């Protein structure tokens, strides 16, 4: 069985950033298999029929799609059966430490 290349993405999120928001209109939605240490929340509009791959999971996306990718998780996207040329992608990237801060804040209010 052949090996699959996994790209190590260097995100624009700096250690000093709390989070980073990127809004990108796209004519197609494909991205090779990659990994990065940051968590990523992806919201997509008009990408029905595209495929998302996270770890061993392969799923076809709906018209509206929301996906949380854990830091270190291998993931990719493929246009597959997506016919739209008017795709909106909004990505929020953040460090795992933000989850710790938020969960500590919520627990302290209980």
Give the label of every model feature segment.
Residues 2-13, 66-110:
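A hydrophobic/aromatic-rich effector-binding and dimerization subdomain
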């Amino acid at each position: 069985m052949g090996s699959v290349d996994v790209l190590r993405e260097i995100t624009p999120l700096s250690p000093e950033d709390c989070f980073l928001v990127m809004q990108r209109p796209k004519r197609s939605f494909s991205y090779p298999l990659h990994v990065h240490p940051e968590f990523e929340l992806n919201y997509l509009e008009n990408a029905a029929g595209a495929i998302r791959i996270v770890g061993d999971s392969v799923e076809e996306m709906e018209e509206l799609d929301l996906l949380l990718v854990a830091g270190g998780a291998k993931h990719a996207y493929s246009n597959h059966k997506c016919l739209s040329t008017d795709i909106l992608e909004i990505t929020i990237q953040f460090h795992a430490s933000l989850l710790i801060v938020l969960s500590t804040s919520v627990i302290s209010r209980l």
